[in-house]
Design a protein with these regions (language model features):
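Short, charged, surface-exposed secondary-structure boundary motifs
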Residues: 89-95
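Basic, amphipathic alpha-helical segments enriched in Lys/Arg and hydrophobic/aromatic residues
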Residues: 71-72, 76-79, 97-148
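Polybasic low-complexity intrinsically disordered regions
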Residues: 1-86, 134-138
Length: 148
């Protein structure tokens, strides 16, 4: 092993790795990042958006709810549709576009498709680069029908 973690984190359920994913409007993967399972989602959000050529709308779940991230997306020329965290107080949920938020399922569907590959869902690879290669291969297989 090397001096860094190979993006394998520890949780009460055992070793874990998160895949942070950006998809296009058709649900096809554009870019992804790996992180340790115990790391918070918002830590990798700006890096993921930075990799995108064009940012129109960022739709994300409550894990990405942060005002600095919303400002970052606005600076890139996009808008955010992110569910607000409750923080134990009443929040105006009418400010979020619920019709657009329904498209968040495109990301979940992409995860469901790659989790069909056993080597990805259970992560047999010890090295981060090998696991990232397998995830990339699965995403390429999702793109393949577009060109055949």
């Amino acid at each position: 092993a090397t001096e860094y973690s190979e993006q394998i984190g520890q949780s009460c359920g055992g070793n874990s790795t998160k895949i942070h994913l950006a998809v296009d409007s058709g649900g096809l993967p554009i870019c992804f990042e790996l992180s340790e399972g115990q790391r918070h989602d918002i830590t990798y959000a700006e890096n993921l958006v930075e990799k995108l050529d064009e940012v129109n709308t960022v739709i994300a779940d409550k894990g990405y709810d942060s005002e600095p991230f919303r400002c970052f997306v606005r600076q890139k020329g996009g808008r955010t549709v992110i569910a607000k965290r409750n923080y134990g107080k009443d929040i105006d949920k009418s400010s979020m576009d619920r019709c657009l938020y329904r498209y968040r399922h495109l990301v979940e569907n992409a995860f469901a498709r790659i989790k069909q590959y056993r080597s990805i869902s259970t992560r047999y690879d010890k090295l981060e680069r090998n696991y990232a290669s397998m995830v990339s291969l699965a995403f390429m297989l999702m793109w393949l029908p577009m060109y055949c």
